[in-house]
From Swiss-Prot:
Keywords: Cell membrane, Membrane, Transmembrane, Transmembrane helix. Belongs to the UPF0756 family. This is UPF0756 membrane protein NMC1845. The keyword Transmembrane applies. It is a multi-pass membrane protein. One of its GO terms (cellular component) is plasma membrane. InterPro entries: UPF0756_TM. Pfam families: DUF441. PANTHER family: UPF0756 MEMBRANE PROTEIN YEAL. It comes from Neisseria meningitidis serogroup C / serotype 2a (strain ATCC 700532 / DSM 15464 / FAM18).
Length: 148
């Protein structure tokens, strides 16, 4: 009889997500556990192949939607010349580049995702963090362990 620790790990993530009030991890782990334990398991390779790209698309839509709703305005060109705006642009570029380093690392060494998720959950639960970390954390990790 083969025993898989994956369901136990997913249940642990669900519990940690509930305790840390991290809905992203709670919902994601719940959906994956349901998929794994039902006939929906046939769609796991599809999620594995396209899930990250779809998630980034949804995140980008969420970030851009205040522009469309009018809650945020595109600043005039002159405002792009102050220190805060220039800093924001360069930090945005750096963070996007950093996350870009993380994606290949997560693909080449998927076992590291487990550590990144555990660290993210601990950071949210006990350090007042927010769950936006896995891609950035993977980018930082790529400096520590090498790009691939």
């Amino acid at each position: 009889m083969n025993f898989s620790f994956v369901p136990l790990f997913l249940v642990t993530l669900i519990l940690l997500g509930v305790v840390s009030n991290n809905n992203s991890i709670t919902i994601s782990a719940t959906i994956l556990l349901l998929m794994q334990q039902t006939a929906l398991v046939q769609f796991v390779p599809l999620v594995e192949k396209h899930g990250l790209n779809l998630g980034i698309i949804l995140l980008t839509i969420g970030v851009l939607s205040p522009l469309v709703s009018g809650k945020a305005q595109v600043p005039p060109v002159a405002e792009f010349l102050n220190f805060k705006m220039i800093s924001a642009v360069f930090i945005g570029i750096f963070v996007a580049w950093l996350a870009g380093r993380g994606v290949p690392l997560m693909g080449q060494q998927p076992v590291l995702i487990t550590g990144l998720l555990i660290g993210t959950v601990i950071g949210v639960a006990f350090m007042g963090g927010i769950p936006v970390g896995p891609l950035i954390a993977a980018g930082i990790l790529s400096f520590v362990v090498g790009k691939g």
